[in-house]
Amino acid sequence: MSGILGKLFGAGAGGKGAGKGPSPQEAIQRLRDTEEMLSKKQEFLEKKIEQELAAARKHGTKNKRAALQALKRKKRYEKQLAQIDGTLSTIEFQREALENANTNTEVLKNMGFAAKAMKAAHDNMDIDKVDELMQDIAEQQELADEISTAISKPVGFGEEFDEDELMAELEELEQEELDKNLLEISGPETVPLPNVPSISIPSKPAKKKEEEEDDDMKELEAWAGNM
């Protein structure tokens, strides 16, 4: 492909640019410019084809010679248009291939750069020293776990008690509390009640209720007599 690019952009075998072709970015840009130019040419030819077709229809049987000339020009334009379509396809394929190659080149460059950086980072590392460091870390972690376990164990500091004696004392306290509660329930203190006021309650509400009941009975008797 480098030979093709050299011929395309004027780098001859013995010329000044021999051995140094254009950059991928420059070649891609020129291919895009060529595509744009050919696309404009396509639009121009399509308009010319429409114009010649309209002229052929206009003349028709009235001016057969003019109609035939218009159709011939239309055919030439169509042939040029087909050639441009093929050229555009070729240029598009070449541009995409060049873009992919350029992308791959950039990717490889970046990967090589990262590999060098990783190598530089590992230059001061020794696998034996790393193993020793990890072993020291494991030992220190084990020691820390042992210290934590020792600290968390309860220490009596000489205070030893009989569990049975403590349970017996606890039962006595519970029984005393129970007896106290029973005494409070069975023997409450007598609280003097206040004197009831000796006020006569009026009997009007009861009398009114009796009158209402008498009225209801009268209405019921009147209803029964009408039946």
Swiss-Prot record:
Keywords associated with the record: Coiled coil, Cytoplasm, Endosome, Membrane, Protein transport, Transport
Entry coiled-coil feature ranges: 25-185
Cell wall biogenesis/degradation as UniProt keyword: no
Region (Disordered): 1-26, 186-227
InterPro entries: Snf7_fam (IPR005024)
Primary location recorded for the protein, binned into one broad class: cytoplasm
GO biological process: exit from mitosis; late endosome to vacuole transport via multivesicular body sorting pathway; membrane fission; mitotic cytokinesis; nuclear membrane reassembly; protein transport; vesicle budding from membrane
Disulfide bridge partners, by residue number: none
Superkingdom of the organism of origin: Eukaryota
Signal peptide start and end residues: none
One Pfam match: Snf7
Compositional bias annotation for Gly residues: 9-20
CC terms in the record's Gene Ontology section: cytoplasmic side of plasma membrane; cytosol; ESCRT III complex; late endosome membrane; midbody; multivesicular body; nuclear envelope
Localization per record: Cytoplasm, Cytosol; Late endosome membrane; Midbody
The keyword Ligase appears for this protein: no
Membrane topology listed for this record: Peripheral membrane protein
Assigned protein family: Belongs to the SNF7 family.
Subunit structure: Probable core component of the endosomal sorting required for transport complex III (ESCRT-III). ESCRT-III components are thought to multimerize to form a flat lattice on the perimeter membrane of the endosome.
Described purpose of this protein according to its UniProt entry: Probable core component of the endosomal sorting required for transport complex III (ESCRT-III) which is involved in multivesicular bodies (MVBs) formation and sorting of endosomal cargo proteins into MVBs. MVBs contain intraluminal vesicles (ILVs) that are generated by invagination and scission from the limiting membrane of the endosome and mostly are delivered to lysosomes enabling degradation of membrane proteins, such as stimulated growth factor receptors, lysosomal enzymes and lipids.
Protein name: Charged multivesicular body protein 4b
Organism: Gallus gallus (Chicken)
Gene this protein is translated from: CHMP4B
